[in-house]
Amino acid sequence: MNPEQFTESLQQALQQAQQIAQTRRHQEIGVPHLFKFLTQPGELVRQIFSEAGADLDQLQTELDRELDDIAVVSGGNVQYGGSMSSSLATLMQAADAKRKALGDDYLATDTLALALMDQTGDQLTKYLNQQGITAGQVKNAVDRIRGGQRVTSRNQEDQYQALEKYGVDLVKQARQGNQDPVIGRDEEILDVIRILSRKTKNNPVLIGEPGVGKTAIVEGLAQRIVRGDVPENLKDKTLFSLDMGSLIAGAKYRGEFEERLKAVLKEIKKSDGQIIMFIDEIHNIVGAGKTEGSMDAGNLLKPMLARGELHLIGATTLDEYRQYMEKDKALERRFQKVLVAEPSVEDTISILRGLKERFEIHHGVRIHDNALVAAAKLSDRYITDRYLPDKALDLVDEASAEIRVEMNSNPTELDQVNRQLMRLEVEEAALKKETDDASVKRLADVQKELASAKEKQRTLSERWDSEKKSLQALSDKKSALDKAKHDLENAENNYDLEQAAKLQHGTIPKLEQELKAMEANDHHEDWLVEESVTPDQIANVVSRMTGIPVAKLVAGEREKLLHLADHLHERVVGQDAAVDAVSDAVLRSRAGLQDPNRPLGSFMFLGPTGVGKTELAKALAENLFDADDHMVRIDMSEYMEKESVSRLVGAAPGYVGYEEGGQLTEAVRRNPYSIVLFDEIEKAHPDVFNILLQVLDDGRLTDGQGRTVDFKNTILIMTSNLGSELLLAGVDDQGHLSADTHQQVMQLVQSRFKPEFLNRIDDIIMFTPLQLGAIEEIVVKLIDRLSARLQDREITLKISDEAKKWIAKQGYEPAYGARPLRRFITNHVETPLAKEIIAGRVAPKSTVAINLMDDHLVFENQSTQPA
């Protein structure tokens, strides 16, 4: 008996049997050790005994009992599992003799099962015979699984029933009702049927973007085969979906994958055209299993495809078809393309309506029709990097799951009562320990409140339980109706007219009537739990997925938006025109009035340095997102050279940094609802403006990897110092800009930027130099910020009007704007104050007054001692 003639599975089984012997400290490997492993899930021998009629759980128990009866050996020099027992050696010799009789080249595990049944003296054989398992039954099971094949390779066990092992019968799935209905793809299904009916090149390949429904078309074909709604040449055909993952998984040795695929193809060939094979992600077969000197899977398929022995349906995406299939012209030639386009919003709504019942039954919720319409429309508008109907189905599924989770959690009212109960019980326990009159009186009040809260809790709990039971009953009734409809379909397909009539005129109308009555009796408006999916829930899911505020405005948000201009004015002083223009753009967008194909707003801020251009962008970000760093800031001084322009959208293929993506496109792809600030735009290379043209006009930009990035939910702000000298000189005492200056600045802008760029910007806003009154307000804001930093030390700052005016006058330089103020306050307020704190003259919990004396600032400590 040569171990080289053992199959891989048998060699592995012997190794595992040795491990079992070592774990149990048995000196020899016996029959129970080997069969303990061979009857594990996934093993061939387990399948053989199962088909022969053995109770596998009881068989495992019997093997454990036999293993427990073997004596445990202990000692220093004992080699556990080092040799075979005489019974196992006899079994192996008998199995080898049977191998020769069967004409097998290798000894396989199924031959071992056949040989075991001939060992009448073995304990395991006796047990199987007692259970009614005979040698004939085991042989029949082996013959069924082998399908007339001999063992000619070391991996033969992997090749038995290859289609069942590596594929899924889609027609069987459809017959059992395990597939979702396919709606609105009749044209593509008919194309597939036409191609399958051809004499040559009868292999369709479905090509389309991910999520458009390629696999659904194949499932639709399977459902048509079940209904008999196909030409005669396709009736009674079987449609198998090949799982390339499980076919490749575990193929350790060269040639093992090819052997498995050959076994699948052999079964298909034997079926004499009755099996149609479907390979999803068919591009994987190009190059699969290819190593140096070997063929890939695609080359194994070519001869059968050419001779018409294999009917194959493939599915792949446009990019992968181009990348893999088109390179192999011989393989591509054998397929006929069927292009699967993304369905329209209207078609998607029809698909969602068709699947509505399936979602309702699965989640146990009610889905409103307007929620389906919202899912199709909102996903089409806001989720731009995916395709319909997949993204719309995701929204409905996610919203339904959210409602289901809420239904299984305590309602808010009940939760509040439970918390109140806990608080009162803690208070009652504490008061019981007190004896004074006030505590006794309070205890009586607490006990009354406790009794009332317990009654309320009981009422709410009963109401909630009743609602849950009602929902479950409704869900069960829907499931029963769905099953009855599926049974009717099967009865009609099988021409069981009596059963069909019984279902159509008896069971189904009765269930529909009961369901209608249940829905009419439930008054959902006063329920504790929300059990229906509405457009609001869909909008919330979109907001969570994209970060774009799609949901209806709640009262607090309305108030916030109506006062957006006021909040911006508080932070940005002296620039009313700019603040109003930006806040109006935001209001238009949130009211849904802006052009859906352009950014929310695009502005160019012109003005001298330090007048609030960048500050306004930060203030807007803070008001919209509650954080002023929630914006994409691009410093255009970094894009002065032609070579650096590509960094915005990402390097072209073949260049360093191609995989990283662009600094602008990646930032907006991750945060589609954001403010994009192009700081110092005039410093950028002219090529940058060419990139921005399509962003400003169509709200989209294609990055270096060919992906389209959506800018329709961004506010674009460009700042520039162009015409600063003119703006500084052309302002009157009240801070108003003269018409001549305005015209001169616009001429300067037009000479610097191309007309097609300027024409696409919503508004060009000129920031005027700050007046003294505005500077005084800024001083107060800067002192307030300093005061906020001192709050940790519990130190309060106060500033007198004289000090404020003096700082404004001394620290402001019109040419430099408000920025020198910060430096002035750092030198004249922060530094002296820091010295006072370090010296211990300003203690915590004290108030420091900043006053003006003899043309310099003085700090007066108004100490407040702790109470």
From Swiss-Prot:
**Region of interest (NBD1), ranges:** 161-342
Region NBD2: list its residue ranges.
Answer: 557-769
Residue ranges of the region described as Repeat 2: 84-148
Region span, Linker: 343-547
Q: Where does ATP 2 bind?
A: 607-614
GO molecular function term, any single one:
ATP binding
**Region annotated C-terminal, chain positions:** 770-867
Q: Which GO terms describe its biological process?
A: cellular response to heat; protein refolding
Q: What is this protein called?
A: Chaperone protein ClpB
Record the organism.
Lactiplantibacillus plantarum (strain ATCC BAA-793 / NCIMB 8826 / WCFS1) (Lactobacillus plantarum)
